[in-house]
Amino acid sequence: MKKFLSLMLCAALTLCAFAAHAENAELNIATNQYYALLERMEQFEQESGISITCEKSVDIMDTISTAYVIKNPDIDLFVFTAYDGLYTLKNMKYYTPLTDSAILQDAFQHVYPALRPVCTDDDTLMGWIIDASPMGMMVLTEYLDEWGMKSPETFDELLDECNEILAEGLLPEETGLLMQKYTQSGMMDLFMKYYIMTSLQEGRRLDFTDETFLHYVQRIKDELPAEEEPRMAFENIFMIPGASSAPSQMIQFVPRIFPEQNSAVETYVTIAVVNPYGKNQAAAIQFLEYCATHLTDGSYFIYDNLTEPIENPSMVAQLDELAEKIALLEQKADKERADEDTLRDLQEQYANMEQWRYFSSAEDIAYYQEMAKSLYVSEGSPLTYDDALQVLVQRYLNGAFDAETFAKECQNHVEMIYAEIGE
């Protein structure tokens, strides 16, 4: 942590030096993440003196491809979500290496290992993570407790519990089962997505002939309904939302598909890449160094050395106010019965509020560090749950072939992709 703080100081000194002669400095950014970047861009402008012009791009890969073809010098930095085409950009070698930035190189050592490949092309640091949002499962445990159930740890247990909840008619009004439809099609989509991500996250070659795959696709087809009754739902028992602004134990692993491996934690990453033809590359790198050293609560999703609990400022202010009132009453010489009652009430109130002092406790952060071993980021690779696989799923569910034939068809499809990308 001390080394990281020294990096922040180094970056601040660099920023001050840059600002001294940055009166006419500019930075031109093309992004499809404008509003997510807005506050950080404004802060950087104020501290650096660099003027930022931002092009809001609807189709960021079209913007990048056009800039590549014409060698556009008027865009210095591309900021976009990795799944929008980082894979393609790396194949094009369309980036400015960041290897000369000591600040970024040092900060990179603290990026969670599962996220480091996003920033690199082979061993070259070629981009910087601006934001990361992991997706996990959130479970309304109060309902499960009431029904004598526990949070499912495996995909089999998830199917078992969903089947039982429906069979027993346990769902309260205005409460759904899952965010996606609990149908053959809906659960095949969920299963296929996590089977692929978890296989790739572990570095395995996709194998749809695996017994685990055959077991689940057969079970989903045999046990789940083809359609779901319409239902007005304001909440769901099982949800897969994005994480909040800081680590929390409310976000859990999606139930395991493979017996000895946690499911992949799908993570949406905003990445920044410096245009090799940009005329303000130094300013672009300066901005990335600023992002790497000016941390937010969301930085806990990126850097593994951030372990201090994150306090809730408004709750801390209320606790401080209560502490003052308690101290005054404790110091009062001649306390009356009413004073003793008030003091006891304030102390109980303080104890209850103390459990909400932190947005993220040390336990929350430790829990996320375990989840972070399974982070998976799609970079727009062709190895995904693509249209062709979705068509095969529908054909399988419509009875075009059995589970084994379906698995072979899926395998034939991905083998063609492996051949195309030379793997």
Please annotate each region the language model reported:
Residues 23-34, 50-55, 77:
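Short, well-ordered beta-strand elements
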Residues 33-51, 389:
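Short, polar/charged alpha-helical segment
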Residues 36, 120, 326-420:
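C-terminal capping/gating helix-and-loop segments adjacent to ligand/active sites or protein-protein/ligand interfaces
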Residues 47-111, 142-153, 231, 241-246:
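Extracytoplasmic "Venus flytrap"/periplasmic binding protein-like
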Residues 81-136, 251-258:
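Hinge/lid segment of periplasmic solute-binding proteins
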Residues 124, 246-324, 328-331, 337:
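Extracytoplasmic/periplasmic substrate-recognition and gating elements
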Residues 124-130, 135, 159-206:
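Extracytoplasmic/periplasmic solute-binding protein
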Residues 191-194, 199-229, 247-258:
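Glycine-centered hinge/linker elements that transmit conformational signals in sensory
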